[in-house]
């Protein structure tokens, strides 16, 4: 916050609520405007803790709301097309793993050979965003693809690729981003009857907020399909 507060005091020597709002509105990007407003709010809290008066109005500084744009979700068709475009066993195994597990890029790249349990059918994610290890079920196509890829490999890393390498691979395959595959995995699982509790555990989410977001997206998707079927039946009958 130091940089934003330094800039703020330099440009508004005698700040008030009106001048502060004007200063914030000079920033075109909502994300930056939010951060600046948060810095001012944080200073207000610090001032209150240290019994410094005269800054109570800072708490009224509005924090701009970011627009929640629809996010891309990988579909069955994306999966099928990406598999067709792969040119080697490693790339195919990566696509199968993304579709089967919904792993984050960093988690995918960190997988070691001993993390794959082919008999039980799961992968062990040792390093995750939450810092807690977890197991994620592995589909039969993913197991087969990984087995083929690992044949003859001498390194312990399953894929031997960096997160940026995964990004470039997906671009080369004209496929959705890794996070879109994660969303697609969650929606596909929920669509096929996997419980929200199981999806949350496999994804490594500590709360149900993310699952609720995907459930909402799935509800909208199913509603569209139902309407399309109804219109098709209406047109056929008509």
Over which residues does each language-model region extend?
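DNA breakage-rejoining catalytic core of tyrosine-based enzymes
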Residues: 53-55, 65-81, 130-140, 153-159, ...
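Short basic/aromatic active-site micro-motif
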Residues: 174-193
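N-terminal core-binding DNA-recognition domain of tyrosine recombinases/integrases
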Residues: 2-70, 149-153, 172-174
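Active-site/catalytic core of tyrosine-dependent DNA strand-transfer enzymes
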Residues: 139-180
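Conserved tyrosine-mediated DNA breakage-rejoining catalytic core shared by Y-recombinases
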Residues: 101, 110-148, 209, 216
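C-terminal secondary-structure termini that scaffold catalytic or DNA-interacting sites
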Residues: 229-238
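Catalytic-site neighborhood detector that most strongly recognizes the C-terminal catalytic loop/helix
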Residues: 73, 127-130, 203-228
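Basic, Lys/Arg- and aromatic-enriched nucleic-acid-binding interface segment
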Residues: 76-105, 109, 130, 182
């Amino acid at each position: 916050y130091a940089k934003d507060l330094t800039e703020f005091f330099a440009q508004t020597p005698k700040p008030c609520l009106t001048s502060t709002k004007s200063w914030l509105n000079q920033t075109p990007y909502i994300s930056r405007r939010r951060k600046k407003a948060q810095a001012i709010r944080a200073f207000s809290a610090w001032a209150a803790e240290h019994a410094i008066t005269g800054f109570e109005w800072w708490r009224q500084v509005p924090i701009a709301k970011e627009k929640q744009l629809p996010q891309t979700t990988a579909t069955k068709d994306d999966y099928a097309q990406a598999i067709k475009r792969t040119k080697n066993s490693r790339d195919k195994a990566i696509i199968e793993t993304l579709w089967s597990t919904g792993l984050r890029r960093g988690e995918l790249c960190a997988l070691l050979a001993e993390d794959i349990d082919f008999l039980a059918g799961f992968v062990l994610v040792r390093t995750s965003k939450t810092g807690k290890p977890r197991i994620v079920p592995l589909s039969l196509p993913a197991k087969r693809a990984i087995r083929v890829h690992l044949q003859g490999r001498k390194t312990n890393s399953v894929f031997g690729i960096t997160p940026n390498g995964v990004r470039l691979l997906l671009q080369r395959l004209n496929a959705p981003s890794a996070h879109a595959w994660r969303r697609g995995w969650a929606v596909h699982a929920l669509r096929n009857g996997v419980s929200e509790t199981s999806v949350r555990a496999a994804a490594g989410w500590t709360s149900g907020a993310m699952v609720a977001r995907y459930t909402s997206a799935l509800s909208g998707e199913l509603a569209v399909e139902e309407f399309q079927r109804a219109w098709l039946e209406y047109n056929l009958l008509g």
